[in-house]
Amino acid sequence: MKIKDKKLHRIASTAIIYRKTKGEIKYIITQRSLEENAFPGMWTVPGGTLETDDYINTQKTTKDQWYFGLEKSLRGEIREEVNLDVGKIKYLLDIVFIRPDGMPVVILSWYCPYKSGRVKLDEDNIDYAWVTYPEAKKYDLIEGILEEIAMVDKILKGKNKDSVQYRC
């Protein structure tokens, strides 16, 4: 596989959004449009890629830098894709892969509680569901999403994050 630029990576982030309802922990998943180039019709979680427009036209935190650019970008993607606001965003894990076009990609996966809003999907998604971890197993999820939901489920139920392993 030919890599375009070994130092250049596309950066994306995803959010495992949860809410506690009647003693159950539920997670929002969305079904991608059938017109999507990658994983059409499959189920996933909200997220997207970091673009310079996400921060370049905002006030810098220091003379030369923008702090929390990725978090602001992820919050914007969540609002855009499902119209929700979330609470504190916590780091879960990172994923790296190389797209078929040779572009290296870094995905940072986060988890956060639902805070407010009513779900309204954008044009990139055609359906959504709030599901428990066992219910999520019934959906055609993009590879790895179920395992990430399982990790968050264990964390939220008081199991040690360090004891959760993903095929290592």
Residue spans of the language-model regions?
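Nudix hydrolase/Nudix homology domain
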Residues: 41-43, 48-53, 109, 121-168
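Acidic, metal-coordinating catalytic segment for phosphate/diphosphate chemistry
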Residues: 1-23, 35
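Short loop/turn microsegments at loop-to-beta-strand junctions
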Residues: 12-13, 69-70, 126
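Short, well-ordered beta-strand micro-motif
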Residues: 17-19, 31, 109-113, 132
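Active-site-adjacent beta-strand/loop module that shapes the phosphate/pyrophosphate-binding cleft
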Residues: 85-88, 93-118
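Residue-level preference for beta-strand/loop junctions
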Residues: 9, 66, 70, 104-106
